[in-house]
C-alpha cells in the first residue's frame, strides 16, 4: 500500500491526538519497561545475572530476557500462590531459577501480606495488615553467595515498601551491579517515597537514567507509582551534564 506522505503525516497526528487526550491510559505503554530496557541495552550495558525480586509469575524476567538472552535469571518471590507458575517456568531452563522467599536485610523470617484476590500486591511491611503470615526471608548477598552467581548484575525490585531493607542486604551485590530497576511510590512514609528513595539509591553510587510505566490511582487519578532505572554514577550517561 503506497500512501502519500501527507496522508501518513495526518495519520500520525491523529494517533498523537488520541494519545494526548488519554495520557493516563497510554503512558504505561509509551513509557514501557521494554522501551526503557531497550534504551539501556542500546547503551552497551551488559549483565551476567539478573535478580528479579517480587517476580510473581516471572513475566518481567521473560520480557527482560529478550534484551539480555545470555544472562542467568534468578527470581525471588514470597507468595506461594506463584510457586506452580515459577516451577513450570524454570523446570527445563538451566538459565532461570527461583527461590520462594521474601528479600530483606538478612536471612531469616518476616511477616508477609498478600491476597489471592490481588496476587501482585504482596509486601513484607510488618504493618501492612491482614491477611498476614510468616515466610522465609533471604538477603541478596547471601543468596548470591549460596548459589554462586556472578556479576555484573541487574537487580529489579517490585516489593511495595521494603526496598531499603533489601538494598541493605545487597551491599556486595551492588558493588557489581550495573542496572537497578526499582518501583517507587508517591504516598506513604516520607523515607520510602520516591524523592527520598532516589536520593538513597544515588548515595549507593547510582544515577537515574530512565523511567517506565507511571501509574495513577483509581481514587482520584493522582500519580501513584513509577519505575526508575539506575546505572552506575561513573557511566558516561550519568556524568554528561548537557541536554545536547
Where are these regions (language model features)?
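Phosphate/nucleotide-binding beta-alpha loop and adjacent structural elements of enzyme active sites
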Residues: 1-244
Amino acid at each position: 500500500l503506497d500512501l502519500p506522505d501527507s496522508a501518513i503525516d495526518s495519520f500520525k497526528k491523529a494517533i498523537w491526538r488520541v494519545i494526548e487526550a488519554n495520557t493516563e491510559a497510554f503512558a504505561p505503554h509509551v513509557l514501557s519497561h521494554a522501551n526503557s530496557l531497550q534504551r539501556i541495552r542500546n547503551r552497551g550495558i551488559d549483565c551476567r545475572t539478573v535478580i528479579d525480586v517480587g517476580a510473581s509469575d516471572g513475566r518481567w524476567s521473560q520480557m527482560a530476557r529478550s534484551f539480555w538472552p545470555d544472562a542467568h535469571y534468578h527470581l525471588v518471590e514470597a507468595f506461594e500462590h506463584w510457586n506452580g507458575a515459577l516451577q513450570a517456568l524454570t523446570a527445563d531452563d538451566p538459565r532461570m531459577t527461583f527461590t520462594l522467599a521474601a528479600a530483606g536485610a538478612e536471612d531469616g523470617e518476616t511477616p508477609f501480606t498478600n491476597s489471592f484476590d490481588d496476587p501482585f500486591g504482596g509486601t513484607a511491611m510488618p504493618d501492612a495488615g491482614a491477611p498476614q503470615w510468616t515466610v522465609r526471608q533471604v538477603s541478596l548477598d547471601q543468596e548470591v553467595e549460596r548459589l554462586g552467581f556472578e556479576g555484573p548484575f541487574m537487580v529489579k525490585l517490585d516489593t511495595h515498601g521494603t526496598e531499603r531493607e533489601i538494598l541493605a542486604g545487597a551491599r556486595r551485590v551492588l558493588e557489581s551491579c550495573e542496572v537497578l530497576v526499582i518501583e517507587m511510590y508517591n504516598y506513604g512514609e516520607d523515607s520510602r517515597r520516591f524523592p527520598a528513595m532516589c536520593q538513597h539509591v544515588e548515595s549507593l553510587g547510582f544515577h537515574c537514567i530512565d523511567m517506565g510505566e507511571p501509574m495513577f490511582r483509581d481514587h482520584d487519578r493522582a500519580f501513584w507509582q513509577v519505575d526508575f532505572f539506575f546505572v552506575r554514577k561513573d557511566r558516561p550517561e550519568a556524568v554528561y551534564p548537557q541536554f545536547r
